[in-house]
Curated annotation (Swiss-Prot):
Record gene name: MCA1
Pfam families documented for this protein: Peptidase_C14
Record-linked PANTHER family: METACASPASE-1, METACASPASE-4
Region (Disordered): 1-70
Bias kind Pro residues: ranges: 60-70
Keyword Protease belongs to the record: yes
Naturally occurring in which organism (per UniProt): Saccharomyces cerevisiae (strain ATCC 204508 / S288c)
Activity regulation, free text: Activated by Ca(2+) which induces self-processing and is required for the activity of the mature enzyme.
Annotated protein name in UniProt: Metacaspase-1
Assembly, per entry: Monomer.
Post-translational modification: Proteolytic cleavage of the propeptide appears to occur after Arg-72 and/or Lys-86; it is not clear how the processing takes place. Proteolytic cleavage after Lys-331 generates a large (p20) and a small (p10) subunits. The small subunit may be further cleaved to give rise to a shorter product starting at Gly-335.
Region Prion domain (PrD): start-end pairs: 29-131
Biological classification of the source: Eukaryota, Fungi, Dikarya, Ascomycota, Saccharomycotina
Family according to the record: Belongs to the peptidase C14B family.
Outcome of substituting R72A: Prevents auto-cleavage at Arg-72 but not at Lys-86. Does not affect catalytic activity
Length: 432
């Protein structure tokens, strides 16, 4: 949902005139200092000097003075403990009586991505799957919009859950992970627009073939009018930093320019967006259906699917999902009429030889749920991803998409999406 209406949101601070360091000590030293040490050394002192100029002309923030104070509420943020998280992910995760293979068995005839350079059929455009054997870096962003009337409850929990997921099972070191959340005292780690952009630049800086980069965003998302003609629905997808009211959102074109364009062939970026209207939030040119084929826009098919979901939600008494499905139908029809986008031209422009894969929480015309799962506030998409990958780590691209949709079906109207920077064989093993 769109997070902003009115100016007086954060503690009725009006224009906010800036960020002040809170008087109290950090609420949780476990996450305050230990991760992303290189990031701290590289950007902690000279934040904003190097790469701001690169994007300031094309993506200028709104006019007016920058904010001066961020008065964070005095109540503590959601508490998170590693042991608690393992138990809360699912009542059956570590239960020996639960047979994970019965729920999400490994796909048949699954193979690892080939190391050789590939070529798009009928063209000379090369691309390369990453083997994910090089350096690992991650950027994790969770924004609850604390103290605002648009406050979310599960995004900071999502950030810490993803942190533990990466460090416990996928070889990511805390020294190479940056977490931005709006419950922190360290101003470098508050998810302002400037901090988020610089952290994105840090994530992809000096990446080499077979490196594995991971981006997770949990927070508000929305849409704004598309000005460069690259969107089928006429709308750009955006995400909202904590200071979006004064500094503006971050649009999909900008994130593509920062995190996709600079990557070399063979560099892996796995992006997970748990936000509304996030289907094409990285502007990747290839989107895949649950049948494993590249999707082409078909608004009437989407309307039919949303209508079926609405009927199921009505029959089960799920009012929130019913409203979401009906809203999705309206946005699909409204956005799909009268747009004539040169799809092949857009694919050529947005293509990347790097190995960029995105899992998003919903279609461009859908909202994503702030949910309660296993007794914990969480984003529905983040919870589904961790649950599926924990129960069965050996997933193909296709089975991962299908199983995440199964996790959300019936409870939520949103449909997770899979997109990529180049054509992918969806039957290959999903690695990161």
């Amino acid at each position: 949902m769109y997070p902003g209406s009115g100016r007086y949101t954060y503690n009725n601070a009006g224009g906010n005139n800036g960020y002040q360091r809170p008087m109290a000590p950090p609420p949780n030293q476990q996450y305050g200092q230990q991760y992303g040490q290189q990031y701290e050394q590289q950007y902690g002192q000279q934040y904003g000097q190097q790469n701001d100029q690169q994007f300031s002309q094309q993506y200028a923030p709104p006019p007016g003075p920058p904010p001066m104070a961020y008065n964070r509420p005095v109540y503590p943020p959601p508490q998170f403990q590693q042991e608690q998280a393992k138990a809360q992910l699912s009542n059956g995760y570590n239960n020996p009586n639960v047979n994970a293979s019965n729920m999400y068995g490994p796909p048949q005839n699954m193979s690892l991505p080939p190391p050789q350079t590939q070529t798009i059929q009928g063209t000379d455009q090369p691309y390369q799957y990453s083997q994910c054997t090089g350096r690992r870096k991650a950027l994790i962003i969770g924004i609850n919009y604390i103290g605002s009337k648009n406050q979310l409850r599960g995004c900071i929990n999502d950030a810490h859950n993803i942190f533990n997921f990466l460090t416990n099972g996928y070889g990511y070191s805390s020294d190479d992970i940056v977490i931005l959340t709006d419950d922190q005292n360290d101003l470098v780690r508050v998810p302002t627009r400037a901090n988020m952009i610089r952290a994105m630049q840090w994530l992809v800086k000096d990446a080499q073939p077979n490196d594995s980069l991971f981006l997770h965003y949990s927070g508000h998302g929305g849409q704004t009018e598309d000005l460069d003609g690259d969107e089928e629905d006429g709308m750009d997808d955006v995400i909202y930093p904590v200071d979006f009211e004064t500094q503006g959102p971050i649009i999909d074109d900008e994130m593509h320019d920062i995190m996709v364009k600079p990557l070399q062939q063979g560099v892996r970026l796995t992006a997970l967006f748990d936000s509304c209207h996030s289907g094409t939030v990285l502007d990747l040119p290839y989107t895949y259906s649950t049948k494993g084929i590249i999707k082409e826009p078909n608004i009437w098919k989407d309307v039919g699917q949303d209508g079926l979901q609405a009927a199921i939600s009505y029959a089960t008494g799920n009012r929130a999902a019913l409203i979401g499905s009906l809203g999705s139908i309206f946005k699909t029809v409204k956005g799909g009429m009268g747009n004539n986008v040169d799809r092949e031209r857009v694919r050529q422009i947005k293509f990347s030889a790097a190995d960029v894969v995105m899992l998003s929480g919903s279609k461009d015309n859908q909202t994503s749920a702030d949910a309660v799962e296993d007794g914990q506030n969480t984003g529905a998409m983040s919870h589904a991803f961790i649950k599926v990958m924990t129960l069965q780590p050996q997933q193909s691209y296709l089975s991962l998409l299908q199983n995440m949709r199964k996790e959300l079906a019936g409870k939520y109207s949103q449909k997770p999406q899979l997109s990529s920077s180049h054509p992918i064989d969806v039957n290959l093993q999903f690695i990161m």
